[in-house]
Structures are given as C-alpha cells and as structure tokens.
Amino acid sequence: MANLRIALVAGEASGDILGAGLMRALKAQHPAVEFIGVGGPLMQAEGLTSYFPMERLSVMGLVEVLGRLRELLKRRKDLIATLIAEKPDVFIGIDAPDFNLNIELKLRQAGIKTVHYVSPSVWAWRQKRVLKIREGCDLMLTLLPFEARFYEEKGVPVRFVGHTLADTIPLEADRAAARAELGLPDGPLVALMPGSRGGEVSRLGALFLDTAQRLRAMRPGVRFVIPCANPERRAQLEELLAGRDLPVTLLDGKSHLALAACNAVLIASGTATLEALLYKRPMVVAYRLAPLTFWILKRMVKSPYVSLPNLLAQRLLVPELLQDDATVEALAQTLSPLIDGGEEQTRGFDEIHRTLRLDASNQAADAVLNLIGQTR
C-alpha cells in the first residue's frame, strides 16, 4: 500500500472535531498515511503536523476579520506555496469557506486533487459562490441531504456523508438520566437557548425570559434550564435574570444534557436547532436581527425556511417566529402545547435523524480515497 500524504485545513473547533474523525477513519482504511496542514489539538493528536496554530484562523465578525486581514491573507498565500511544494495526494478544506475555497482553487490549478468538507450556505444566499466551488473543488462532502441535491443541480461532484452529531447522539435520549445528572426535579421543563453570541443574547435573552414568565403564568408548574455557551454569556444572562422571580437553572455548557432533560425548547435559529432535533425535543424557533440586516437578508435569502429542521423536512415542521412576529404572547402560546405534546414534530425528527445517521467519518474517508484511487 503506497504512502499517502493528505493535507487538511480546519479553521475552528467544530472543524477540528470533524477533521480528527476523518483522519481516524482514513488511517483505519489506509494506515500508511501522513497528515499535514492546519488543525487544532484533536487533529494534532491524530498525527497532523500543523504549520501554525488553528486559532490564528478562528476570527468572527467583520471588525475582527478586518483587523487581522493582512495576517490572514499572508498565511493563506504562504500555505498555498507550501502545499504546492509538498504535493499532497489530496487537499481537504474543512468548513472555513472564506479561507479554504481560495486555497482549493489554487491547488487544483496546480494539479492537486481538492475536497471541501461541510458546505457553505450557498443554497440559501450568495449562490454565485457555487461557480468558485465548481472551479476549485473536485468533490464536495455535505452533512445534509438537501445540500447535496443543490450541488447535483449545479453540476458540482458531491457526496452526502451524513452528520457526525447524528452518529453520536442516541436515537432515544434518556430524559430521567439527564435530569438526575443535572439534579433537576420531575415535572415540565423548558430549555431556553437564546444563542451563543453576545449579540444574539442581547436581542433574544430578555424576550425569552419574558416568554418564560408568561408561560409560568399559564402553567405554574413549569421550570426552565439555560445552557450558557461561555462565562460571558452566563454573566449576560445573570444580569437579565436579576429581579425576575423565575425557577431557572443556568448551566455552564452542557447543552446536550439540557436538551436530553427538557420537554420542549425555545431556541434561536442556528446550528443548535439540529441538536434539539436529534434529541427529539419539540421546539419553537425565534430570531431577531437589526431591522436593516433583516431587510437585506430577506431579499438575499432564497430559502422559504430559516431553521435547519424545516430545511431538512422540506416543510414547516417547527414554528418559526421571526422579527416582529417573535412576541412574548405568540411565543408562549405556540410553545405551551408542545410541553406535553409535539408528537408530529418528534416523529419528523426521528425520520430525519435516521436519514443523517450514516457513519459520517467513514463515509467521508471512503469518498476521499475513492477520489484519489486508493480504495480498498
């Protein structure tokens, strides 16, 4: 079996998790393999030689990106030159499309096979990016089936590999065990998940807590749990909770335990909705943006739904209350019946979970090795 040299670049923690799983699967199928590129501690533990710390790529927000733009462009230019000199058998860009798609284009022009793992949201907006993907990418690996259908229509070689979260989250979560671990009592429990970013919690935190108070008036026995993404979000939520008489348990992280423990979820639109779906917890999705941002996005977004559960179901499976529709009364009235109901949602969630549960890392490894003619 010939020695393989595989280059990978991940730009953030979620990519590091995916990359490490893919590397494990590649080694299992083709033990004589060397990994080079950029990754975090998990990928390095699997044997990646990282040219520089992954954190140098982990920037969020326009201001932060502009502040680091010169460094990012130089790192990308140097990385392209290094990889062309190293001539890997294949390059795998993991997410981070603004950084990786340009690398893929340059490497493919230099005769190196390229794979992009995790589709950017081209199906929803900025659809012209698909032209760059088609030019720079030998193979797109998608986590979600509707993404693969989009690429097929656009003539991009694609393979739907499933979602690693669907592989790791059990088909039936143990609510009683989760409550015991968190020290939460029996009775109706609602998880409030207003987002992981400061701006999201600023826009949605008070709205979600006001909704909790309204729910409490409608159903006096209901309690609440809020998983906090980090210490900053916890401090923000503690400030919003001051002066409110609400039975709320704040958790540090532990979003998966909160979802397993609860009966229903009030949740910001985002990737956490997929986790709630996989835990089969009925949900109401809410989101508010700055009015101008919402106006612009409404004209740019091509999709009829904003939440992943509805995009995956290809129908309105979960209620979406956006912008001015996201009022306390509307959220409370929509959420209340789901606390001890929501069977239609959970049936749909179970179907979707089974569709996504494909052993993603092995599927991705198969696709990569097949592309470079190294299948077993």
UniProtKB/Swiss-Prot annotation:
Gene3D superfamilies: Glycogen Phosphorylase B (3.40.50.2000). It comes from the Bacteria. Its EC number is 2.4.1.182. It holds the Pfam family LpxB. InterPro entries: Glyco_trans_19. Keywords: Glycosyltransferase, Lipid A biosynthesis, Lipid biosynthesis, Lipid metabolism, Transferase. Belongs to the LpxB family. This is Lipid-A-disaccharide synthase.
